[in-house]
């Protein structure tokens, strides 16, 4: 039985990366440095733009984060692909929260737009995931739209984020 809380701490997210949060067969979040959130502040089975589920998570920004030292030297900015990956991470986390089993894999995204950036002077990134559909057949898949905000300002949007849970990834 999945412990379905409305929020999760950094320690909980790290437990997920070790396969301890959603059980031995549940999906895992990546470990640091690829874990792109510090906490999940809200998870619901309803709500969001489509009333089919909503997740909100946060990442605290500080100038010592690993990507600022290499992307780019003299012009530090968080890579946009990390924000996109964070949204995929949260779709997979939600599928585990619903009780889904398997290994999470990003399956695609319909459209991504970047209209801002995350600099080392920022304080907080907020991720918002609005679920459109959950497929729970042979393949468990989540379809959602996502938003990334920095210090309350919308900077990325993604439409039709897709993540699937697979029992066997050898042929993937």
Curated annotation (Swiss-Prot):
What Enzyme Commission number(s) does the record list for this chain? 4.2.1.59, 5.3.3.14
S-S bridge residues? none
PANTHER family from the xrefs? 3-HYDROXYACYL-[ACYL-CARRIER-PROTEIN] DEHYDRATASE, 3-HYDROXYDECANOYL-[ACYL-CARRIER-PROTEIN] DEHYDRATASE
State the encoding gene.
fabA
Stated name of the protein: 3-hydroxydecanoyl-[acyl-carrier-protein] dehydratase
Record's subcellular location:
Cytoplasm
Question: What role is this protein assigned?
Answer: Necessary for the introduction of cis unsaturation into fatty acids. Catalyzes the dehydration of (3R)-3-hydroxydecanoyl-ACP to E-(2)-decenoyl-ACP and then its isomerization to Z-(3)-decenoyl-ACP. Can catalyze the dehydratase reaction for beta-hydroxyacyl-ACPs with saturated chain lengths up to 16:0, being most active on intermediate chain length.
Could you state one GO cellular component term attached to this entry? cytoplasm
Pathway, per record? Lipid metabolism; fatty acid biosynthesis
> Which keywords, in A-to-Z order, does the entry hold?
Cytoplasm, Fatty acid biosynthesis, Fatty acid metabolism, Isomerase, Lipid biosynthesis, Lipid metabolism, Lyase
The family assignment reads: Belongs to the thioester dehydratase family. FabA subfamily.
Q: Which GO terms describe its molecular function?
A: (3R)-hydroxyacyl-[acyl-carrier-protein] dehydratase activity; trans-2-decenoyl-acyl-carrier-protein isomerase activity
S-adenosyl-L-methionine recorded as keyword: no
The record's listing under HAMAP family reads: FabA (MF_00405)
Gene3D superfamilies according to UniProt: Hotdog Thioesterase
- What reaction(s) does this enzyme catalyze? a (3R)-hydroxyacyl-[ACP] = a (2E)-enoyl-[ACP] + H2O; (3R)-hydroxydecanoyl-[ACP] = (2E)-decenoyl-[ACP] + H2O; (2E)-decenoyl-[ACP] = (3Z)-decenoyl-[ACP]
Enzyme active site: 71
Subunit structure, interactors included: Homodimer.
Q: Which NCBIfam families match?
A: fabA, PRK05174.1
Give the record's GO biological process terms.
unsaturated fatty acid biosynthetic process
An example of a Pfam family matching this protein is: FabA
């Amino acid at each position: 039985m999945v412990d379905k809380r409305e929020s999760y701490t950094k320690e909980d997210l790290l437990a997920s990366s070790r396969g301890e949060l959603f059980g031995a067969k549940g999906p895992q979040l990546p470990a640091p440095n690829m874990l792109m959130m510090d906490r999940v502040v809200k998870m619901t089975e309803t709500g969001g733009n489509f009333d089919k589920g909503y997740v909100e998570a946060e990442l605290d920004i500080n100038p010592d984060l690993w990507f600022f030292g290499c992307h780019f030297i003299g012009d530090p900015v968080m890579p946009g692909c990390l924000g996109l990956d964070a949204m995929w991470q949260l779709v997979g986390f939600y599928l585990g929260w619903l009780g889904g089993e398997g290994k999470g894999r990003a399956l695609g995204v319909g459209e991504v737009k970047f209209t801002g950036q995350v600099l080392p002077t920022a304080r907080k990134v907020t991720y918002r995931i609005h679920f459109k559909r959950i497929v729970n057949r042979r393949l468990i898949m989540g379809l959602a739209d996502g938003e990334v905000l920095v210090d309350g300002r919308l900077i990325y949007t993604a439409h039709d984020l897709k993540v699937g849970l697979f029992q066997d990834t050898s042929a993937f």
